[in-house]
Every structure is written in structure tokens, then in C-alpha cells.
Amino acid sequence: MTTEPLEDPEANSNFVHGLPEASLGNKADENSEDLPGPSEGLDPLPDEVPPEDIVEARAEEDVDQASEANIIATEQDEEQASMQIATSMGQNKDRASMQTDTSTGRDAEPATSMTTSTSGVKEEIPGTPNPSQENLEELTSLLPQDPGILQMFVGFQNPVWDRLAENNRTSRSRTVSPSDSQTQEKTSGKSTVSEGQLEIASNADVPSVLPEDVQTSAGATDPPPSDTTGPEPEPTKSADQEAEDFKALNPESKVRSPKSTSEDLAADSGTPQAPPSPNSPADSPPPSPDSYQVSLGRSRLDPSLYGPEVENDYMRSMTSLLCGGEGSISSLTDILVWSDTATRMGVAMGILASGRSSPADRLQDEGPRLRTVASLFRSARSAFSSGVMAGTSSVLRSVTHLLESVERHTMEGIRSTMRYLNHFTLRWARTGSNSD
């Protein structure tokens, strides 16, 4: 019979590390060494009562097995708990980093990062399963799947796209609005721009939606990280380029030079010049041309909007008062815009300065010329001074009359008093002569 050593270092080390097989074998060997007799097993003899050492050894063996089972279960629970904690912490870190990267990517490269991640997820989902398939499914649940919604979201979040849209609208309004204003102001006799040319011009403009290769390029859409002031504005078009664009859009219309005359403006715009009034005097100047000369691209005044709808005596009298004739008022600007040689204000001032009984007597007369502001001030000052002097002289005359009346009454009172006293003195003289 061979026996093993009592203390085996390998068995002890295996027991420490949680291996139950070696420890159980060592315990069985130790118990077999303590048993008397030649038998190697633990079973007692059938005819004899098992000794107390065997019972105690079996009890210790049961206790050791139970403790080892508890230790193994505890270690397994701890390992599972640590693995779950590590897994949850790793998932939280991955989710946090993923969310941080996603938010940073939205600000820096929204179109590229989101389109790439969506395409990568769509490519990996139909393929063979891999260990990171669950994480990819979580990523796809966070990201939008509809490409239309993705493009709409990118367009609202990216400031570069907003600036591109504003530049497109500016260029569109700058190139199309002059043609629209010209087509609205042309008369029925003039030929207008066809709808096909307008469609070609609108298609020739910068497209509002760029191609997909431009949308996915990060260098074309996003500014560099060092650029904090934003992209530089696009250089504005020169006057020659704008004239060429306008001529390309409207081939029938002529490009006007800045030094175009009023006749060219009137011929191009189709607005007839206001003819001079037939009843106006010969020396009356024509209406001011400033009311009909307007710059390129500005709206023109329509004299029919300011004319009277119904002819009446009041308007005819006002026209004759201001213009010196019996015609109606052609435009509001004819009344508001006056020159130095016009006679409208002069007629009114002549009516005020004349001594006629009725203003109707002055309607057929020309009246004086329009005087300067200095002459008006001088006349007003002379009128004021004359009024003040007239008022002062009237006051002085009234005071003089009052003083004269007071003096006259005083002198009359003094005379009556002297006569009364003279009468008494005569009576006293008579009584004295009679008493003597």
C-alpha cells in the first residue's frame, strides 16, 4: 500500500484558488491514512461498528464540502456581479462617448457624420451577425432613418446652409426683380417677356438644393475649426456683370446707362409725358421734369392715381388759382414741386397783397412773380412794423383825446369856479357900498 505525503503544496495551492477536486482528493487521502486496517476505502466493516474517528472524519468531510460549495458559489456570484458592473459601466461609457461624439458631429460635420453612420449601419444589419450588432441596433434607434428628414434637419442646423440660402435668395431677387418690374409697367402695346424665358432664367439661377456629393463633402459645407468668424461673404457683382445678367434675362430690353436722358426713360418706360396745359399762360414754364425722371429699378409715379375722379368747381378754381388757367390738376407733384420762375405762389401772394374786393378778379390775371424768401421776410417785417406803428399811433391818439377831454373839463370847471367866485365878490362889494 502506497501513501502520499500529508501536506502537499500543490493541493493546498489548488484549494486556495478554489479548485474543489484536488482538495477533495487530499481530504480523502488524509482520512484513508487515519483508518486502521489494510482497506483503503472509507466503508466500515460489515460486522463492526464504525469507529468514532471515521464518523468525525465523515462529518468534517461534509462540513468541508459544504464550505467549499459556499465559497465557490460566493466567488461565482462575485465574478458575475463584477462582470455585470464592468459591462454596465462600459456600456454607459460607450453610450456617453457615443452621444458626445454624435452631438459634436452634429455641430461640426452634421451631414457627413450622420449620413456615414446611417449607411454603415444599413450595410452591417443585413450581413452576418457580429458581436457588436446589438450596439449598432442601439445606434440606429437613436439616429433618424428617413433620408428626407435627415436632410431637413441638417439644413436647419447648419448655419452655412442658411447663408447659402440667403445668398441664393439675394441673387434671385437681384436678377429677377428688375425684369418683373419692367414687365408690370409695360403697356399692352409693348411685347412682354415670354414665360419660357422666365423659366429658363429661373432654372439658370443657383439651385436651392445642392447635389448629394456636395452635401456629403465636409470641406465644402463646414468651415475649418480655426475659423471662428464664419465664412467670408461672397463678392458682390459689379455693375457690368449685373447689366450682362439683366440683358441675358431680357434680350428685348436695352441696358440703360447711368447718364440716360429723360426722353430715353420716357420711351423705355412707356409712361407718357404730361403735356402742358393749353389754357396756361405762354410764359408759364412746363411742369418740373423731376416728377417724371426716376432712376433705374425704382417705381414710377402714375399721375392718374393723383388726379381727381370727378370734376368740380372747387378743383377748377384751385387749378386756376395755382396754374393760372381753367384746366384740372394733372398731378400732385405739379402742385408740390415749384420753381423760382413759376407764378402759382405769386398769384396767391398777389391776391393777398392786392386791394381787390374779390379773389375772382385775380383769376384771369397773371399776378407778380414768385418772390424770394428774403423779400417775403422783408414784407412781413414791414407789415408787422406798420401794424405795430399803427396800433401805437391809435393808442397815442386815444390817450391824447382822453387828456384833451380831461383838460377841457378841468378848464371848464376852473372857469365856472372863477365865475362863481366873481359873482360872490360882486355881491359883497354891493352890500358894503350900501352899508356905508
From Swiss-Prot:
Here the segments flagged for biased composition (Pro residues) are 273-289
Compartments where found: Cytoplasm
Chain intervals for the UniProt region annotation (Disordered):
1-142, 165-307
Span of the signal peptide:
none
Keywords for this protein? Cytoplasm, Phosphoprotein
Q: Would I find Phosphoprotein among this entry's keywords? A: yes
Which cellular component, as a GO term, is one annotated location?
A: cytoplasm
Q: What is this protein called?
A: Testis-expressed protein 44
